[in-house]
């Protein structure tokens, strides 16, 4: 669900799709997916598409402008996520570690910062592995120092996009309040307008916490929610998390400005691949045990 769905078509259909820009919704499962990859059986021709709710057709997803500075999407799903960010207000990027969802989100956010956004707000639940509470008080240091460990994934992504000088640029943007790091538990009472708000590791939130954060986002803003439903550090079950409740709600599915996509291709080490395979095996085992107990 939410993955880039593959549809095999004839070469002439690919050619026509590029000419006309739309195609009949042949085998697309538009109830579970929004993005599609049309490809020939030999894999030599392909095109990305998105489902148009109003026409019921698949429309061509143009990828030429989907890049920023040192960033360019590495696969079809990353291209679809970047496109979704440019064309929607609420976007959920799903995927395991190494799929590039944070890098794609930040590339879009930095692009918007240079265009018309007032600032970028970076959030993340402050949860250690195995802990159930979100709190930063126990960590030594001032507010900025406390956040550095939690926000490291953002720094890593910025370095990929900006290069070695990212620390200098980041310092300037922070001084001007154009990039703001916010502890997740301090979002209550905040209100963000004309901003790009990114919430990473959303699988570690409760439904109440995530919905509270969503309610803080105001006019002319984009909210990007990132997470991996299968890697939860907060002690919650997958179905109890805010991320899971959000993407499986009827309201989200029917919302005209909300979309979700799952990234699956990993660009990390073989060790990271192994960890993900083990996580998936354990999840499948737990689901089988739960089914047998019902």
Residue positions per predicted region:
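Walker B catalytic carboxylates
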Residues: 200
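Short glycine/proline-rich turn/loop motifs
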Residues: 62-66
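Conserved helicase motor core of SF1/SF2 NTP-dependent helicases
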Residues: 1-5, 13-16, 67-71, 75-196, ...
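Interdomain "pre-motor" coupling segment immediately N-terminal to P-loop NTPase/helicase cores
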Residues: 1-61
